[in-house]
Amino acid sequence: MEPVEQQPYSEYTIQIEAEGFEPKEIAGSQVLADTLSRQPTTLNVMESGETFQRIVIPPHTLFYEYPPKIEEAEIKPINENGEIVLSKVVIPEYIVVHDGPVNDSAAGNYYVRYKDYIKNVASSEIYATWPDDTIRANILAIMSFTLNRVYTEWYRNKGYDFTITSSTAYDHKWIYGRNIFASIDRIV
């Protein structure tokens, strides 16, 4: 699918301040017409001096060209030395998201609730204005791919300490700090 010429959402910058807490700014929060969303965030307690946290939300995957998916073999070799495959399908409470390409050692790892990960990816890869059945079908595809990464311990078997990446070259687009659309939240 080619990116559209006109951006179908507005971007807002949200500034959050509360006494005793570090101020935070979230730039690029995406707002679709007639669509509710929530901007999850937390504030850190101010310790010494004033610090400022800024989160920048990049463009939506349907509006911007991210790296294309790197092809993987449809049938993966099994029983490699030291390989771990879970004995049963498990829906985890948390997954570890590596916020960058696989080999980027400077990218952070985030412990994210599985359900919140699915909501974030869906909000990053599909539009919340789509029909409910279309949203549901896409969410099921996202869940299937993600659970495959969990079940096969895909990255851990390669020596990494995370479950999945945020890079579209390998996995889904997960965006740290992004807003979640109500229609997607409800379906997940």
Predicted stretch roles:
Residues 2-188:
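Conserved, single-site charged/polar hotspot
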